[in-house]
Amino acid sequence: MSDTSTKTTLPNEEKFKDLMDLPYSELESIDDADFWAHYWAVWNANNPCVPGGPFVPNPEQEWVLQLMDEGKSIFINSPAGTGKSALVKHWCSKTTTKNIGLTSTTGISALNLGGSTVHSFLGIGLGVDTVDELYDRILKNHDKRELWLRLDVLVIDEVSMLQPELFDKLERLARKLRSSSERFGGIQIIATGDLFQLPCVGNDSSLIVDSKKFKKCIQVTIKLRNIVRQEDAQFKAVLNKVRVGLVDEHVEQVLKSRFGKTKSLPSNIRPTKLFCTRKSVQDINEKHLNKLAEMGYEFREYNMEFINQECPISFEYIVQNFTRNSTTPETLHLCLQTQVVLTYNQSPYLVNGSRGVVVDFTEEEYPVVEFLNGTTQVIKPHKFALHYTSRRGKTQQVGYAVQIPLKIAYALTIHSCQGLTIDYAIIDLNDCFEFGQAYTALSRVKTLDGLFLKKFDFGVIQPHPRALEYEQQ
């Protein structure tokens, strides 16, 4: 990947003005970083964004809206902050003649989008069952069966975090449920994401574009270029370089200027703390709980209960595997004023990832949580199904884990905040272990002034090799 700071010859001013008047579809194929930097600088200066105002699409977004209106299945593979989610929400709001499924791969990004997780919306549970098992499951659920049959468009935000094997499974399931030989059963696919951000958790080195079905379903792949989350040209340039793993002297200089700046934060600002690992997040959360204890708040303890349903192998092994991978803690301590996050969907508006504060407890000792969207809800214990997969690939339910679906949330992992925009963030990148993790974290923040970094080794900034390969194709 070439250094985007390298100077190339720009069109003369007269020719550039002529190009600005052309339809974006005629310019889209131009692969010149300096041209696009100049193009968007001029366009943004003449069309300033109004904070809180209505969504006004720019030329490249207008082009994408036209493709969606035409019924094209598209993949918007674009940098963080280019308005992918806002664009999709705008199209869905103005498209009233189609049944649209608005989904994302994570709870937090689904909440940000105003939709549901793809697993919840399509009724596939964890998605671990075979196509035939999922088919039987959906046939037994009248509402989900009707949903699949009526669906015209399926939006999948943050699709780069979806396992390619699961997409293949969904494509086959769609054709089977709808008795159709068309790709994805004739459903239009609108997928958005960024291959340079975090890939799906627990997967090998493959990406969504390694799915054979995905390649066949997608008719147009789009790269949006105009970053709207950050306005500072210098910060944009740094993020564009970090995205592809280009760490030059300028990148180091700018990021080092944000080391150890937390003391300059106003006292009324509570920045979001982002960490690479669950362990670091747990340590911060425990620190805040200890402060609440010192203030005299009374804690309630909730322990996960496990129910065995004739498991064919060691049930202890099943339990250990579940607790190791579950986002719901085995032991949960809560008191008034504890900041929490949901770990299981409660409603279309309260989903896995919704953040809130404990404001009361019921007579049964269930926590009452006031969420950021203003909703207050009693959170009761949930039964999490425990599964076992045989060597032949047969998956069966072997028991339950019962727990209050909450966890402490004073700090977040970088994985859990992909797709979000954050005003102020304290980021610790010292334990980066995944391709794209550093870029994902840095690109959450709107301004350099809102970015506060712990010192880190710049060697942790690494793009996914397959993402680079795909970008260069």
Curated annotation (Swiss-Prot):
InterPro entries: AAA+_ATPase, DNA_helicase_pif1-like_DEAD, P-loop_NTPase, PIF1_helicase
GO terms classed as biological process: DNA repair; telomere maintenance
Molecular functions per Gene Ontology: ATP hydrolysis activity; DNA helicase activity
Gene3D superfamilies the UniProt entry points to: P-loop containing nucleotide triphosphate hydrolases
Domain of life: Viruses
Family listed: Belongs to the IIV-6 030L family.
Listed name of the protein: Uncharacterized protein 106R
Organism per entry: Invertebrate iridescent virus 3 (IIV-3)
